[in-house]
């Protein structure tokens, strides 16, 4: 049974699942910001095909809201959790332990075959969320789903330190290429 010290996911799980169900089958899944792997484990157990592949990007340093967190322990817990839910399956995973900007540059350069679903839950600053979104867009397959977490998050003061402004900017610029499938604490879109 995977171990988690926090639960920032379960309260959004119904909306998350509804969005991912529109991307089925999910053979390839990309997650930006994975912490201890709660959402990644959920995707592996409930949404990823039996031979699916998951890519998780996280620098395991956290943001200003994580000053007191031991990220060496977070990384070890993440690996233990992912390995446990993958145990005995044909599914595969890759962890890219660097900034999302570096990792997404690398994934775009590798000429990836694309992802059926992308979950953006890394840095919470508007600029980083916008960059993650734009850099992920070419990696999302036609008909694929992109989900952002923490759209309404305001634990840190200043709109530039919150995801909403970055998500709104992306939605405005790409409005003719997307269908919004959910808009709440999480936002989900489908690529046309």
At which residue positions do the language-model features occur?
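S-adenosylmethionine/decaboxylated-SAM
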Residues: 2-192
């Amino acid at each position: 049974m995977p171990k988690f010290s926090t639960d920032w996911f379960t309260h959004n799980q119904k909306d998350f699942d509804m969005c991912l169900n529109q991307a089925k089958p999910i053979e390839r899944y990309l997650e930006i910001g994975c912490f201890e792997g709660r959402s990644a484990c959920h995707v592996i157990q409930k949404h990823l095909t039996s031979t699916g592949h998951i890519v998780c990007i996280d620098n395991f340093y956290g943001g200003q809201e994580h000053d007191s967190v031991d990220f060496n322990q977070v990384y070890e817990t993440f690996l233990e959790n992912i390995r446990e839910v993958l145990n005995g399956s044909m599914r595969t995973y890759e962890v890219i332990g660097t900034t999302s900007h570096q990792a997404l540059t690398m994934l775009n350069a590798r000429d990836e075959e694309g992802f059926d679903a992308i979950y953006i839950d890394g840095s919470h600053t508007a600029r980083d969320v916008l960059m993650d979104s734009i850099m992920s867009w070419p990696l999302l397959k036609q008909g694929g789903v992109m989900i952002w977490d923490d759209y309404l998050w305001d634990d840190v003061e200043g709109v530039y330190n919150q995801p909403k402004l970055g998500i709104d900017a992306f939605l405005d610029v790409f409005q003719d290429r997307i269908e919004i499938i959910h808009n709440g604490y999480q936002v989900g879109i489908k690529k046309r």
